Amino acid sequence: IHDAQENHPKKAIKFIVPPNCYGGTNDQARRVAACIENVEVVDLPVDGDNEMVQSIETILAKIAAEDAIPYIIAEIPTNPRVEVPDLIQLKNALSTVRKTKTGDIAIDPVFILDQTFCPNVLFLGADDLLSSVRTLSYASGSKFPSGGKCTAGYVVGNKKSEALMGKIELHLQLCDNEATALQYEILASQLPSMNQRIQDAYQNTRDFVNFIKDTLPSAKLNFVSEDLAAQGFTPSVFSLDLPTKGTTDQERETHKRALNLKLINLMISEIPNESKFCVSYGQSQGCYWTIPATSTQGTTKEGDKDYIVRVSLSPTMDLELHKKVFLEFVASI
């Protein structure tokens, strides 16, 4: 916003954000927009019947016509459906030169990519997919980058977004929000082994997902395909839509929510040292259960919350015990 106000004074600024985008990202975007007159949040539908690239195409065309400034915040893979868009189509949608109503060239978008789920995938290098698009990539550090040892994350810009990085640095310092010396030390020591932790946690997750498919085939699971995993998208989080019953939508939803809590309460009571019930992408140990699977932050509208279970696994956990307890749950329903 600071950069836009300096380079394009008085122009409208649009933050394009999935309404169910996770946690603080969604919350902060809406709080900032509420404070500044020419800043507005535009919903980016990426879930259900909506597809990220198509939604971006539609919204960017509209914003270009208005001669406004587009900042897109998105997660790849998405939350909570763990989907990856067609990346070539995404690049094309972000690279298209658009025109304003008066025929001038519209301001190109900045793609702000939350890579917390898959920080191992390279998007920004000279030969990588988004090298030609103004892109910022950021990741929460609490799970993989720091090995669960601190909460500091990081943001990286490509060549096209270098000008924005200076402003980000300035604001981190203004807000006294830069990582501490100790956090830098932790990240420096942990990052070299990050990719191995990601792989180990993915293997546990794939194993657990396959087990659930076998033991409760009527459940709907959202996780990356084997093909996407082969491309490097190896998250360690999946969402679980439990089978429900009832004659009305309300009855089915109520029954499903009760089942969600039954499953989670069984897990945390049977495996108290590893299974945790909280809003988290997890740490380097144990297994984290979140409901609703979308943001629980106060600014997220109730209708955008998805009451399915989000499960986040780690590289070090007793997977066989989790399978055993899940089997108990299946037997009980």
Q: Whereabouts are the PLM-identified features?
A:
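Conserved beta-strand positions
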Residues: 74, 113, 240, 311-313
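Active-site C-terminal subdomain of aminotransferase-like
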Residues: 136-304, 313-318, 325, 332-333
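Conserved PLP-enzyme active-site core in the AAT-like
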Residues: 2-213
